Amino acid sequence: MKGSNTSRWAIATGIIVVALAAAWYWHSHSSSNEATTQQQRPAGGGRHGMRGGSLAPVQAATAVSKSVPRYLTGLGTVTAANTVTVRSRVDGQLMAIHFQEGQQVKAGDLLAEIDPSQFKVALAQAQGQLAKDKATLANARRDLARYQQLVKTNLVSRQELDTQQSLVSEAQGTIKTDEAAVASAQLQLDWSRITAPIDGRVGLKQVDIGNQISSGDTTGIVVITQTHPIDLVFTLPENEIATVVQAQKTGQPLAVEAWDRTNKAKLSDGTLLSLDNQIDATTGTIKVKARFNNQDDALFPNQFVNARMLVATEENAVVIPTAALQMGNEGNFVWVLNSDNKVSKHLVKPGIQDSQTVVISAGLSAGDRVVTDGIDRLTEGAKVEVVDAHSATTASEKPASREHAKQGANS
């Protein structure tokens, strides 16, 4: 029994010793790893840096001084400078068409012909009547001459002379009527040849050869639209009228550009032609008309386009990317970088602006560097790292990647 107790104590003592040794070994290695980790970890960045001591990556641009044009924009519709519905001025059968649909024609070009037979007959009749009445007049004049001689010898009375004089005058009046009839018949014959009244592009024909047409037809034969030049009618807000009028007082024509619906492609260049004489009370806008040469046929009647009219040019303007301009409780501001790459907030007054750039009227000077990307990570006085677009994207993705890797390891 005694030997058995001794054996139990020996085993228990051994187990205790092994447990103590294991505990010492684990504690010493844990402390060593923690110390190593503390030595390798960089100092925290505080409010001037990001996690792990790295600087916030930003993109920057330098404010530049340049001339900036001021444009007024509006949606407009292209309209033909002149539009004419070509109609026949006489009645008859359409005998020939001398144009191709869609072709450009000049004023005076022959477009169509109506059967001239009836008009030739009418002209011949009028000319025959004129010739007859001219012969009658000649005979009356000869008789008058004889009467004038005979009245001197009292062979004819004074009354007979006066009667003959009246016959001559009557014949002269008849001649004038006949001449007018001849001119009218000639005009009807001329009108059987239908010509273009203006320069322009002909549309689709409205009637085919062989049809009977009349001067009362409202449809006409074809429509001609003058496209060289061509007009653009667009609208501007009524509060811009003073700007346009002031620009017109310089005496220089105001340039107008026509852009497509997406505002990506410029179609043509023209000049301001006129302003309407009244404001549309319903919309609070005024109509403006510009004229374009359109020799390349880039503009087409009834086409919708965006109009841009140059009214002024601001010289030596301070310009920055639009992305740098921010809005806060105090108004518009930008983040400005100093030589140490530390940022500070500057309140600014913006001017002319588009989707790419903005003019800063006050609060910034040419040569100042402004932050254009990474703005949401900035605080006053923070030091940042200026990187290009690719570097900024990579840097912003790294913290998320490390966090994802850490979560994967823990799982």
UniProtKB/Swiss-Prot annotation:
Topology of this chain in the membrane: Peripheral membrane protein
Protein name: Multidrug resistance protein MdtA
Leader peptide range in chain numbering: 1-21
GO molecular function: efflux transmembrane transporter activity
Lineage: superkingdom: Bacteria
Keywords: Cell inner membrane, Cell membrane, Membrane, Signal, Transport
Start-end of Basic and acidic residues biased regions: 399-411
Similarity field: Belongs to the membrane fusion protein (MFP) (TC 8.A.1) family.
Keyword flag Cell inner membrane: yes
Cellular localisation: Cell inner membrane
